[in-house]
From Swiss-Prot:
Organism this protein belongs to: Bos taurus
UniProt gene name: RABEPK
Descriptive protein name: Rab9 effector protein with kelch motifs
Keyword DNA-binding in record: no
Chief place of localization: cytoplasm
InterPro entries tied to this protein: Kelch-typ_b-propeller, Rab9_kelch_effector
Amino acid sequence: MKQLPVLEPGDKPRKETWYTLTLVGDSPCARVGHSCSYLPPVGDAERGKVFIVGGADPNRSFSDVHTIDLGTHQWDLATSEGLLPRYEHTSFIPSCTPHSIWVFGGADQSGNRNCLQVLNPDTRTWTTPEVTGPPPSPRTFHTSSAAIGDQLYVFGGGERGAQPVQDVQLHVFDANTLTWSQPETHGKPPSPRHGHVMVAAGTKLFIHGGLAGDNFYDDLHCIDISDMKWQKLRPTGAAPTGCAAHSAVAVGKHLYVFGGMTPTGALNTMYQYHIEKQHWTLLKFENSPPTGRLDHSMCIIPWPGTCTSEKEDSNSATVNRDAEKGDSTEKGVTQGGDSQEESQADTLLCFVFGGMNTEGEIYDDCIVTAVD
């Protein structure tokens, strides 16, 4: 596995750089198909927590929950009861229960699931709510969903092996009313697939990639829930190659896509998609990229302080040398110190845990990089 620089507590992350997070405590074992969610701080807590739920290795499916306290930089095995073992499920946090984590779908060694369960982090208990309306058929899921407000949107997913479910209906679960529905959509939906990413930005849902059998897709689709019309987008720029089992997040006007698998191996690339300009950019990094991986999980976390660039680091070094010589010009003072507002700002990081390569090596590392 490639060695990345370590981002220590209190460090300012540099732009265009991948880091490893080293955390103490009861960390999860290596796994794939887990979910990764960030919960903001509650009560007197200064920083939020990352929740790693479920997953699998070649021998078993997991029903455990591990957390990272971003204030203490410690792992904790959040002993909980009631979660059915599952991997390649999805996790989401609806607006109506902002401090609870819901999971849907996935599988264990006995087959696919289509049930919903809810974690109360305070009591560390899972419940299985009674829902109404026709649910999607059991399916592996993972990144094939996205939530907007109280609603989870489901499209596609895996049925058996490399074959997706043949259903191209958009399924909607309302966490407030505990109801499944299948709204009428317009336009041509994406073809059946699994291992695609589905991410929400505003009122739009974006779907990229995935596979069916040995066919890897590189297309990008969008549906706006305000008019329920499917569109196949034709973006410009350096688009990702056909891939599956990758990850995606939305930050402001951008989508970020990382990793995945192709017919030739696992990817370690990250792409940025500008939603308004419909333009792809392959991001370049100053250091070596992380090990290529698939079936990992990714979320956005806040990191205290602003990030720096190589140019800013160089300027800071020059200022420090000038200060040692007694040069306290206005320029030097301004460049040498952060304002109080800057020091209190947070940098957003893409946080990635686990996954595997196409040779079967499974990972248990935490890697991060700053995003705009």
